[in-house]
Amino acid sequence: MAKSFVPLIAVLCVLVLPLAAMAVGTPFHIEGSVYCDTCRFGFETIATQYIRGARVRIVCKDRVTLKSELVGVAVTGPDGKYKVAVRGDRQDQQCLAELVHSPLSRCQEADPGRSTATVILTRSNGAASTRHYANAMGFFRDEPLRGCAALRKRYLADGDNRAI
């Protein structure tokens, strides 16, 4: 009885092998965006300006050795978005998209709360897609634009003007 299953199992293994090889060699595609926080609110608003030419890098850190490795770099396009292909499954490494540089002279200070974004670079988490999205990252403008106080009122809860 067991001998009758051996050819079937062998055929299944041969058929699955190319799929496994393709998955290992297929790069991950990371997408994200970079913006200038023109009101220094710490989040995107209708006054947000997306940055063309901002530089971003993808860095992975091994959780055991704590060694960091640069695995990708990108520059944002006209809409402030970047795309970068990263080869290799990073399994249990912690990977981050990090801001490197803003070409806008009045928007150079990285927002400490939005200067990095976690990216998942493993096929062992159940996600079938190789396309992954990083949270938007931002730089603060040196001085807020005029009209930011009025904009802040729009974003506050009804009647909560204490924060202004």
Swiss-Prot record:
InterPro entries assigned to the protein according to its UniProt record, in alphabetical order: Allergen_Ole_e_I_CS, Pollen_Ole_e1_allergen
Disulfide bonds: 36-107, 39-148, 60-95
GO CC annotation: extracellular space
Primary localization: secreted
Upregulating conditions: Epigenetically down-regulated by vernalization.
Keywords: Disulfide bond, Secreted, Signal
Known role: Part of a three-gene cluster containing FLC, UFC and DFC, which is coordinately regulated in response to vernalization. Not regulated by FLX.
Protein localization: Secreted
Signal peptide: 1-23
Family recorded in the similarity comment: Belongs to the Ole e I family.
Pfam families (UniProt xref): Pollen_Ole_e_1
UniProt keyword annotation of Signal present: yes
Protein name: Protein DOWNSTREAM OF FLC
Source organism superkingdom: Eukaryota
